[in-house]
Amino acid sequence: MNDTTWSDKLRLRSHFGFTLMPFAKNMKAAQMFDSSSQRELLRGLQLWTDVRGLCLVSGPPGVGKSITLRRFVYGLDQALWRVIDFSYLPSTPTGFLRSLCRKLGLPMRMHGADLFDQAQSYLVSHQQDHGAHPLILVDDGEGLPVPVIDLLRRLTSSDLDSDDHFSIVLSGTEDLLATLAHPGLEPLRTRFSYVQGLRPFGLEDTRNYVRFNLERADTPPKLFNASAGRPRSINKLAVQALIQAAVQGRDEIDGDFMNALILSHPLFQGPPGG
């Protein structure tokens, strides 16, 4: 019921008097709400650009890791940084190297060793040749197997580790942390120059997030007091509540309405999450 069509959104906006649809997930980076934990992560990433190297971001699903990384990338000087981001992560080292070479505009090679050598050589020399420091952004990394994650370390190993010719940000859930605990990845664990976990919203952040979305939609009423601490879950419940309220002809949504909705929602039995 959360997957609404454009005409459905128009009807919802008309029912509540919104000029924009609140709780959207496709907002521009500069317009996004940031919690105290997200601000800490963003500031840490900005300071880490002076250090560079390997960075690890972790946190439960739906707490805003990808959104915060988008804000971080949005704020980078494109003349000084070249961001190579992965929206699809191959599950084999050769597949990862092929995807990396494709994004770098490099030719395909038959053997994995040749793919590795040309990608590493290109990344190591890119800043000297073009002036921009390469940044590989690997988001949703919890599904990566150990050999692919170790490949990231091996890519950065050159010139006896004397300089960080390019940087990598690896982000994922607790499952990624469990994979990183593998004994074979100990050399990688020791090389992260910055590690930060992203926390779910606290109660005050949740209130501010709801208020932020409603003010952006140009509507004055208070929608509800608070929900769970994960932005993705808040969005799901908020949109569900808006639709259900419109179906019932309600103009206001209060705590009792939200409690009843959560209890009847098949995906939110108990405290909201996911």
Go through the PLM ranges and name each one.
Residues 2-12, 165, 204, 208-211, ...:
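C-terminal alpha-helical "lid" subdomain
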Residues 18-25, 81, 91-110:
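Conserved NTP-binding/hydrolysis module of P-loop NTPases
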Residues 1-51, 263, 267-274:
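A short, basic N-terminal segment
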Residues 73-75, 176-191:
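Short regulatory helix/loop adjacent to the ATP-binding pocket of P-loop NTPases
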Residues 86-89, 180-183, 193-205:
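Conserved AAA+ ATPase "SRH/arginine-finger" region at the nucleotide-binding site
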Residues 102-104, 174-175, 183, 201-218:
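Conserved AAA+ ATPase "sensor/coupling" helix adjacent to the nucleotide-binding pocket
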Residues 51-71:
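Walker A/P-loop nucleotide-binding motif
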Residues 13-14, 92-95, 107-151, 159-164, ...:
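Mid-core helix/loop region of P-loop NTP-binding domains shared across ATPases and GTPases
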